[in-house]
């Protein structure tokens, strides 16, 4: 053991990291456990698209804390780090670097090959940056063997997975309405869009469609996407709803509008804002099914010639039926464009309507009046056109939730395109059953996950992009047949232009795009141009990360709540397809990090907290502890800088306790030896019991994991059990003679407790714990704290002792509160206290009377009732009056004759009969009346009564403590060592009878003549109002 100095936790981080690196500690820990039971962890991969943020820091700290615990429990932890390196997150960043404004410029400005190379460079560069940041947080993972989806081996397993899906009939190419990003020019999957809805303002337009065969009669529709009216092919009504023919008089004309009956008033009120409506009335009512087949004239027929062709079709421009129609706003008649809405698409197929989507990849019209115009830019002109045609009922704005691209944040479009899908709908029931086998933390995530699966559609896995795993599908240009290639070996066997392509070392575009295969029909097969959804990449992780084609269930995974419908789902979906099972056993969902006001952190708001800045100021361990203790990890975390100061205070308290203990041990050349355990006092046995109880709680809660209970338990032990209680109890014992058994027992207790505390603390605060361990360990101990197990010495746990001490601490706390109330500081002794309570309290007080006296500074303790006190009965006249009315005086007379204390005890059991009257507890208030010089303070199991009388002797003793405190403060100012002796001289107060005590407490010697190195004047005020002006002089003996 070496003397401990005050700590800078950031510098401590660096020192311990250096120790770990120089001694290869991580590898030695893995080596120690390599033959033990395996624990398989799959790292949810962060995107290599920039520096880490507080959320990713929290995520890795959760993982690292749990895995450190598992290693310490002896498991052979498989802990590969993982990275997400494909997809739009990287592409968008690289586009920004090159000033690329749209997808076409990738090919025209720099070319696909260079773009792919730059994406790879970007991903690898930021992988290194982020890895360094994670290491800065103290995160131990297998960084050297991290899994990267850009490797040939990983991508090949992706191909194999898709081929299995194909062989099982779960892969299909189909024309469907999908989410489409016009900026990235690609389709997106449903799960990518969940959580990406934002509140926006869009047009709110009510439009009339004139019926073809009924004069002056119109159906009224409502839409927030006027641009889709260009592609309208039908109007849908609910077959069972009531619809009204409404005769409307307005603007000097009369028309009939067809509107759902329940929405007539709402629609007319909207119309009044645009038209001078004089009168309206319902002239006819029909069911929705009676409207089926009614033809209307398309409102933009002249603006889009294609609509004239559609008008010739049987079901186009007609009213059709659909169960999806609601009466929650709008008109009850739904504008239907099968090429631009999922429900529109389904109902359109039912009526054999064309799947018409007249827009290109950039979201621009490809025909008609607005050809070449971005659809959203056409909204205003379309509305104006409708107005000019007399078809506009109302136009305004509406604030609603609308999906955006998860990477570039552009509002998405709904667009019918041909895409590749995994038909999850066919195995959805299996997926739901699998989910029920997982241990979800918190448990309600299971319901959230299953509900998400119930509503999820087939997985659109194709992306019209570049940087990703190419879809391994080759299509024959002659017959249209396609094959799915499952490996490089298979590809090399079937390729017909090997000489042109050469050896296949990279599976990215454009390399694989050059490869041609021969079809059975003799035609040439080319690869489809799409790449796989990046969530397909991460979904492969449970088996592709370790390079196997078999199910290996992860023992533990954890990610933020946005991943419930993303990564938790994507890896499950793929494993369900390939292995018919779920790839993880335990899944913890954590929250998001927010600013102190609960707002999302963003650069534009200027509220981003950089984890590197926090670590630089406080050290990694303090950030780690804060993030795991601020609240339950599944709740969103509000980061508050001032709360980091609270954690700093906690760790300083821990370090000060450690420094206090070790520096006294070093001073006395203490050598730990279990033989000193035979000299333990009750307070020593108590703290030993407590640290083992804490270890037990820690193990139980880390196993779940419930990090909040684990960290809160540690905090309570450090602050309340160790620092504020045990060290206070044994402080005087450290000043005894060097070989005193009582002192050595205290040292051995502190040594044992600090060593075990460091072990318990190690998962969350690895640097601090390692530093403490390295100074406490003996030659026969393990090289690192992480080669030790968190263990519980059950034989040392004494629950009765812990209960007794808890009562005593409550009593002492009550004394402190009483002192505050009567303004009588702890330095002045109390003449006497009386403690009232049950047998449990009496036993604890008798056992630890010496502690109560010492810690409460009390001269005498009694148990029971206070002399001169009495219980009195106060009738509750309001309650008595309700029951007994005119007989209340007789009831009060009966109460006055009763024994108050006896009545109080009887009322605890329920109602009591006095002189024939029923007395309920609410009829009376029974309270204890105590003498004026007694102050009563309640605690959890009783009351402490403090005798507040002050005597001269009590004041003198208090003054002695006042002087000791001031001499100690002056020693601190002088920066004296603990053992350094001093000469002292005190003027202005007579303390001759306490000289020996003062000399012992301050390691000093009173002298008459002094050459002061430091002197100071003090004013001391006593509780009885007296003032003393005291001069204290100190001279160092060893100068």
Curated annotation (Swiss-Prot):
Extent of motif 'KMSKS' region: 600-604
UniProt KW Aminoacyl-tRNA synthetase keyword: yes
Top EC class of this enzyme: ligase
Recorded GO MF terms: aminoacyl-tRNA deacylase activity; ATP binding; isoleucine-tRNA ligase activity; tRNA binding; zinc ion binding
EC number: 6.1.1.5
Motif 'HIGH' region per UniProt: ranges: 46-56
UniProt keyword list: Aminoacyl-tRNA synthetase, ATP-binding, Cytoplasm, Ligase, Metal-binding, Nucleotide-binding, Protein biosynthesis, Zinc
Gene Ontology biological process terms in this record: isoleucyl-tRNA aminoacylation
Gene Ontology CC annotation, any one: cytosol
InterPro entries per UniProt: aa-tRNA-synth_I_CS, aa-tRNA-synth_Ia, Anticodon_Ile_ABEc, Ile-tRNA-ligase, Ile-tRNA-ligase_type2, M/V/L/I-tRNA-synth_anticd-bd, Rossmann-like_a/b/a_fold, tRNAsynth_Ia_anticodon-bd
Cofactor section: Zn(2+)
Location(s) in or outside the cell: Cytoplasm
Pfam families named among the record's database cross-references: Anticodon_1 (PF08264), DUF5915 (PF19302), tRNA-synt_1 (PF00133)
Binding site for ATP: 603
Catalytic activity: tRNA(Ile) + L-isoleucine + ATP = L-isoleucyl-tRNA(Ile) + AMP + diphosphate
Origin: domain of life: Archaea
SUPFAM superfamilies: Anticodon-binding domain of a subclass of class I aminoacyl-tRNA synthetases (SSF47323), Nucleotidylyl transferase (SSF52374), ValRS/IleRS/LeuRS editing domain (SSF50677)
Subunit structure: Monomer.
PANTHER family: ISOLEUCINE--TRNA LIGASE, CYTOPLASMIC, SOLEUCYL-TRNA SYNTHETASE
Similarity section: Belongs to the class-I aminoacyl-tRNA synthetase family. IleS type 2 subfamily.
NCBIfam families cross-referenced by the UniProt entry: ileS (TIGR00392)
Domain description: IleRS has two distinct active sites: one for aminoacylation and one for editing. The misactivated valine is translocated from the active site to the editing site, which sterically excludes the correctly activated isoleucine. The single editing site contains two valyl binding pockets, one specific for each substrate (Val-AMP or Val-tRNA(Ile)).
Role summary: Catalyzes the attachment of isoleucine to tRNA(Ile). As IleRS can inadvertently accommodate and process structurally similar amino acids such as valine, to avoid such errors it has two additional distinct tRNA(Ile)-dependent editing activities. One activity is designated as 'pretransfer' editing and involves the hydrolysis of activated Val-AMP. The other activity is designated 'posttransfer' editing and involves deacylation of mischarged Val-tRNA(Ile).
Protein name in UniProt: Isoleucine--tRNA ligase
Organism annotation: Methanocaldococcus jannaschii (strain ATCC 43067 / DSM 2661 / JAL-1 / JCM 10045 / NBRC 100440) (Methanococcus jannaschii)
Gene: ileS
């Amino acid at each position: 053991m070496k003397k401990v100095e005050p700590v800078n936790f950031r510098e401590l981080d660096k020192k311990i990291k250096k120790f770990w690196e120089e001694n290869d500690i991580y590898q030695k820990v893995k080596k120690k456990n390599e033959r033990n039971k395996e624990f398989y962890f799959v790292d949810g991969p962060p995107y290599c698209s920039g520096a880490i943020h507080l959320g990713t820091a929290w995520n890795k700290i959760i993982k690292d804390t749990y895995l450190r615990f598992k290693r310490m429990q002896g498991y052979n932890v498989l802990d590969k780090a993982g990275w997400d390196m494909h997809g739009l997150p990287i592409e968008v960043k690289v586009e920004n670097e090159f000033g690329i404004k749209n997808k076409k410029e990738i090919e025209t400005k720099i070319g696909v090959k260079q773009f792919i190379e730059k994406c790879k460079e970007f991903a690898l560069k930021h992988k290194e940056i982020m890895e360094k940041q994670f290491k800065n947080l103290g995160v131990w993972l297998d960084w050297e063997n991290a899994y990267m989806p850009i490797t040939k081996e990983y991508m090949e397993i992706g191909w194999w997975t898709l081929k299995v899906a194909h062989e099982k009939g779960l892969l299909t190419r189909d024309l469907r309405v999908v989410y489409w990003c016009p900026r990235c020019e690609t389709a997106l999957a449903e799960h990518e869009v969940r959580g990406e809805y934002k509140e926006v303002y869009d047009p709110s337009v009510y439009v009339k469609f004139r019926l073809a065969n009924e004069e002056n009669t119109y159906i009224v529709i409502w839409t927030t996407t006027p641009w889709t009216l260009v592609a309208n092919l039908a109007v849908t009504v609910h077959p069972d709803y009531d619809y009204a023919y409404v005769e409307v008089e307005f603007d000097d004309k009369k028309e009939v509008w067809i509107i759902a009956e329940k929405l007539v008033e709402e629609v007319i009120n909207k119309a009044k804002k645009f038209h001078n409506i004089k009168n309206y009335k319902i002239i006819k009512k029909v069911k929705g099914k009676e409207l089926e087949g009614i033809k209307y004239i398309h409102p933009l027929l002249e603006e889009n010639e294609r609509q004239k062709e559609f008008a010739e079709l049987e079901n186009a421009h007609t009213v059709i039926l659909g169960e999806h129609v609601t009466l929650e706003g709008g008109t009850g008649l739904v504008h239907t464009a099968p090429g631009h809405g999922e429900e529109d698409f389904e109902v359109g197929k039912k009526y054999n309507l064309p799947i018409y989507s007249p827009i290109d990849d950039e979201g621009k019209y490809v025909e008609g009046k607005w050809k070449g115009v971005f659809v959203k830019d056409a909204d205003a002109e379309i509305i104006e056109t409708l107005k000019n045609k007399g078809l506009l009922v109302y136009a305004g704005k509406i604030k609603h939730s609308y999906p955006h691209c998860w990477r570039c944040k552009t509002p998405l479009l709904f667009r019918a395109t041909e895409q590749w899908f995994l038909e999850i709908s066919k195995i959805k029931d299996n997926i739901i059953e699998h989910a029920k086998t997982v241990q979800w933390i918190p448990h309600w995530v299971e319901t959230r996950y299953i509900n998400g699966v119930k509503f999820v559609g087939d997985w659109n896995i194709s992306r019209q992009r570049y940087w990703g795993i190419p879809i391994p599908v080759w299509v024959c240009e002659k017959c249209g047949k396609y094959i799915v290639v499952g490996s490089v070996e298979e590809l090399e066997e079937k390729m017909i232009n090997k000489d042109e392509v050469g050896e296949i070392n990279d599976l990215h575009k454009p390399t694989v795009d050059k490869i041609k295969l021969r079809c059975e029909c003799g035609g040439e097969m080319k690869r489809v141009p799409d790449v796989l959804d990046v969530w397909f990449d991460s979904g492969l992780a449970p088996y592709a990360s370790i390079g196997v084609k078999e199910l290996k269930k992860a023992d533990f995974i954890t990610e933020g709540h946005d991943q419930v419908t993303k990564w938790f789902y994507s890896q499950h979906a793929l494993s369900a397809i390939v292995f018919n099972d779920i790839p993880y056993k335990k899944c913890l969902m954590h929250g998001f990090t927010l600013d102190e006001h609960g707002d999302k952190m963003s650069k534009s708001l200027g509220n981003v907290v950089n984890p590197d800045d926090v670590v630089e100021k406080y050290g990694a361990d303090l950030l780690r502890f804060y993030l795991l203790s601020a609240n339950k990890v599944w709740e969103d975390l509000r980061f508050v800088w001032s709360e980091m100061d609270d954690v700093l205070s906690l760790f300083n308290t821990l370090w000060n306790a450690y420094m206090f203990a070790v520096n006294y041990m070093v001073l006395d050349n203490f050598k730990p030896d279990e033989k000193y355990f035979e000299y333990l006092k009750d307070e020593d046995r108590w703290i030993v019991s407590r640290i083992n109880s804490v270890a037990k709680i820690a193990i139980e809660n880390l196993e779940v994991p419930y990090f909040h209970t684990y960290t809160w338990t540690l905090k309570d032990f450090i602050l309340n059990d160790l620092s504020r209680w045990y060290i206070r109890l044994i402080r005087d014992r450290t000043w005894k003679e060097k070989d005193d058994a009582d002192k050595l027992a205290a040292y051995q207790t502190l040594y044992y407790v600090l060593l075990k505390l460091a072990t318990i603390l190690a998962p969350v605060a690895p640097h601090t714990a390692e530093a403490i361990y390295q100074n406490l360990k003996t030659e026969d101990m393990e090289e690192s704290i992480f080669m030790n197990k968190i263990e519980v010495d059950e034989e040392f746990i004494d629950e009765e002792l812990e209960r007794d001490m808890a009562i005593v601490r409550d009593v002492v706390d009550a004394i402190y509160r009483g002192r505050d109330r009567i303004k009588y500081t702890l330095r002045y002794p109390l003449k006497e206290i009386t403690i009232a309570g049950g047998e449990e309290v009496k036993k604890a007080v008798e056992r630890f009377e010496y502690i109560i006296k010492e810690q409460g500074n009390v001269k005498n303790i009694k148990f029971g009732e206070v002399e001169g006190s009495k219980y009195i009965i106060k009738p509750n006249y309001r309650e008595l009056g309700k029951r007994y009315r005119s007989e209340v005086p007789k009831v009060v007379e009966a109460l006055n004759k009763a024994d108050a204390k006896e009545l109080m005890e009887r009322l605890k059991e329920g109602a009591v009969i006095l002189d024939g009257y029923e007395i309920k507890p609410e009829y009376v208030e029974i309270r204890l009346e105590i003498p004026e010089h007694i102050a009563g303070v309640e605690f959890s199991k009783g009351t402490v009564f403090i005798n507040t009388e002050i005597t001269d002797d009590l004041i003198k003793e208090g003054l002695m403590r006042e002087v000791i405190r001031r001499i100690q403060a002056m020693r601190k100012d002088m920066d004296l060592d603990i053992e350094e002796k001093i000469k002292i001289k005190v003027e202005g107060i007579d303390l001759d009878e306490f000289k020996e005590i003062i000399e012992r407490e301050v390691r000093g010697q009173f002298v008459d003549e002094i050459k002061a190195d430091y002197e100071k004047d003090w004013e001391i005020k006593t509780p009885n109002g007296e003032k003393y002006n005291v001069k204290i002089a100190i001279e160092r003996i060893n100068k």
